[in-house]
Amino acid sequence: MKQSKRLFRSAWCRKHWLAVILVCLLPAALWAQDNLPSQAVPDRHSVPIYPSREIRELMRFVAVSNPMPETFRDTLDNVITDPVGSLYPFWQKMSRMDHPLRIVHIGDSHVRGHLFPYVMRRCLEDDFGKDAVEDIPVDYRTSGLARETGKNGIVYHMLGVNGATCASFATPERLDEVIALHPDLIILSFGTNEAHGWRYVASEHEAALDRVITQLKESCPGVHFLLTTPPGAYVRNGRRGKRIPNPRTEKVVDTELRYAREHGLAIWDLYDTVGGKQQACRNWDNAGMFQRDKIHFTREGYILQGLLLHEAFIKAYNQYVATRLE
């Protein structure tokens, strides 16, 4: 009992003296603390968190993924070829996005089906904003023309004609329709029907390309162009023969590549990107992306084409942004 009292008394003494020490030291601690100002002093030394042009440009990069199926063989890097930088003024407009930026995608049934270019359109709207157009569902039965709101952003129009070649598309009515949209960029996707002409003549194809581009260039000041090559298709070997990869597709692609090179235009070579002469058709076919006619594509096939175009497009844009950092 006595031991318990001694322990209690000892503990009480320690607490008592600790309290005394704290009371004695408190005034000194308070005296050492600087007086707090009644109002915070403005920070005159810090700078904005993103002060440099390089950082501002770096923030314009757009993330993009590679949609190429792993089962596709002998593919090439998915890029837009533009050695003279013909699209640089367009990329500059895109990086600023201070007005509605109008893209008009013209072509054959691959464009007329709307799915291939619509995937591209939706991806660009996700990248740069969708306020420039009304959110109206698009399918095969609807118009491919976007309805503008007047706000800044991507305006992507789709004008395709079933069975069209570059030559047959170039009627005054259709060209006037393109011109009336005031495009900043025109994407031309022809070639499948040119390749299905049994008597394909490269010089005639090249002349048709030149007529269309020349007329549009004269009527649309400051417009830029992006050519695309066809995805590939099968034809019958004889009237009732087995279907084989269309041997004229390679000639059509060569014509379009040569025309782009000689006239300083940008081109996206879808055909060679997905396997070219040896593998393009086989890759599409093995993936189950052809329809029964082996010319047109399934929903999955057109979605993939739209994603591939978007990837190449954004990679070219990001390359432009990178040059601004140099």
State what each model feature region is.
Residues M1-P42:
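Bacterial Sec-dependent N-terminal signal peptides
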Residues Q33-P83, D139, S143-G144, G288-E326:
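Conserved catalytic region of serine esterases and O-acyltransferases that act on ester linkages
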Residues D82-K93, A167-I179, A207-Q215, K251, ...:
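Alpha-helical scaffolding within the catalytic cores
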Residues R102, H110-A207, E218:
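Conserved SGNH/GDSL esterase-like catalytic core that processes O-acyl groups on lipids
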Residues R102-I106, V155-L159, L185-S189, H224-T229, ...:
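Structural recognition of the beta-strand scaffold that forms the well-ordered cores
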Residues H114, Y118-R122, D176, S203, ...:
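Solvent-exposed, polar/charged alpha-helical surfaces in well-ordered, non-transmembrane soluble domains
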Residues E177, T192-D210, G222, L227-D254, ...:
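Serine-dependent acyl-ester chemistry module
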Residues G232-E326:
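Catalytic His-Asp segment of secreted/periplasmic serine-dependent ester chemistry enzymes
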